[in-house]
């Protein structure tokens, strides 16, 4: 199968640059997997598509202010090297408690062994390695409350298709209301529509909720660079399946209740965990996944999906196509373009079941 088979025309002005004033005011395109029929609805209508006993699984990761601006402390091995140069660092993946992979600009001017100072709260890191693909490995000097300092010093890393600088309000709006575990450099965007009021309403209707954690990396924005779907390889992302969520999913499957995933990150986590379990009940654990889901994949857990609209020829569009059929999904996307739905992170959503 060719990557080009997942292309569609998307006018630039449909890419949402700002969040709506009310995060729950998004439109929702509902797609029936069994018939391919769709309905133009609102996210507020979601309760009407769920049933008592459904298990709604959400990703409780928190986006960290991963974009840092600092100054080089000076190159120790080259006397006279400029010591005041500005450096931009984008944290991409936590390796250990104090070590991170990162993109550094201008990378060629920041060699191994040089330190970078960020702000005036004691946050500093040393470049300890160059990666194969241009990334750097940083080791931060241990400080108390690292993530709290990062919150004050760093900037929210908005996606590359949002053509503006981050603003203070993005610290709230580019987070889900139920975020708990810091570690992502991109939001699990399907969850951005939920409010505490919506979650409470679903609970009143008998819909159960559970949470996984998958820390989203910058790889989610990388374009596909191969021609064949079979040649695609995904980046690794860290996830955690808690005892409570493993038990909730096992119970739902045993009792023939639907498991509804909020977002593709939740789909990938649950389906990866099903692969690990190999036909047995899920067991709580943490690990890394690089699962790639494309048409032909047989879903083991997920029976419903809430997701935003995705990039043309992207692996996430392939996942949605695997879930509901490529032709049906692309037809729904063409309809969404005609009806001027808002696309991508701050955009509208789809419900597929």
UniProtKB/Swiss-Prot annotation:
The keyword Manganese does not apply. It catalyses: 7-aminomethyl-7-carbaguanosine(34) in tRNA + S-adenosyl-L-methionine = epoxyqueuosine(34) in tRNA + adenine + L-methionine + 2 H(+). It is found in: Cytoplasm. Its EC number is 2.4.99.17. Its main location: cytoplasm. InterPro entries: QueA (IPR003699), QueA_dom1 (IPR042118), QueA_dom2 (IPR042119), QueA_sf (IPR036100). One of its GO terms (biological process) is queuosine biosynthetic process. GO terms for molecular function: S-adenosylmethionine:tRNA ribosyltransferase-isomerase activity. Keywords: Cytoplasm, Queuosine biosynthesis, S-adenosyl-L-methionine, Transferase. Pathway: tRNA modification; tRNA-queuosine biosynthesis. One of its GO terms (cellular component) is cytoplasm. It comes from the Bacteria. Monomer. PANTHER family: S-ADENOSYLMETHIONINE:TRNA RIBOSYLTRANSFERASE-ISOMERASE. Transfers and isomerizes the ribose moiety from AdoMet to the 7-aminomethyl group of 7-deazaguanine (preQ1-tRNA) to give epoxyqueuosine (oQ-tRNA). Belongs to the QueA family. This is S-adenosylmethionine:tRNA ribosyltransferase-isomerase.
């Amino acid at each position: 199968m060719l990557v080009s088979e997942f292309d569609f025309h998307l006018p630039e002005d449909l890419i949402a640059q700002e969040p709506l004033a009310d995060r729950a005011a998004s439109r929702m395109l509902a797609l029936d997997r069994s018939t391919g029929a769709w309905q133009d609805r609102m996210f507020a209508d979601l309760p009407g598509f769920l049933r008592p006993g459904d298990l709604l699984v959400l990703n409780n990761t928190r986006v960290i202010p991963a974009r840092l601006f600092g100054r080089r402390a000076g190159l120790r091995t080259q006397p006279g090297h400029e010591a005041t140069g500005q450096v931009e660092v984008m944290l991409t993946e936590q390796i250990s408690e104090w070590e991170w992979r990162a993109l550094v600009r201008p990378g060629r001017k920041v060699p191994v062994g040089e330190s970078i100072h960020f702000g005036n709260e004691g946050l500093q890191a040393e470049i300890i390695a160059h990666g194969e693909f241009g990334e750097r490995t940083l080791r931060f000097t241990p400080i108390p409350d690292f993530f709290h300092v990062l919150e004050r010093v760093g900037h929210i890393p908005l996606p590359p298709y949002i053509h503006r600088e981050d603003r203070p309000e993005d610290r709230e709006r580019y987070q889900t209301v139920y975020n708990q575990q810091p570690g992502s450099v991109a939001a699990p965007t399907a969850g951005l529509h939920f409010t505490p009021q919506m979650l409470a309403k679903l609970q009143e209707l008998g819909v159960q909720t559970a949470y996984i954690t998958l820390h989203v990396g910058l790889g989610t924005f990388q374009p596909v660079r191969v021609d064949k779907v079979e040649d695609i390889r995904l980046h690794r992302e860290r996830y955690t399946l808690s005892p409570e969520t493993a038990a909730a999913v096992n119970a739902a499957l045993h009792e023939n209740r639907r498991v509804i995933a909020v977002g593709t990150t939740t789909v990938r986590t649950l389906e990866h965990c099903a692969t690990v379990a190999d036909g047995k009940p899920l067991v709580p654990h943490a690990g890394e996944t690089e699962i790639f889901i494309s048409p032909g994949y047989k879903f083991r857990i997920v029976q419903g999906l809430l997701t935003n609209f995705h990039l043309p020829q992207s692996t996430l569009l392939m996942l949605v196509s695997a879930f509901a059929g490529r032709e049906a999904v692309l037809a729904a996307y063409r309809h969404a373009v005609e009806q001027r739905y808002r696309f991508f992170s701050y955009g509208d959503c789809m419900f597929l079941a």
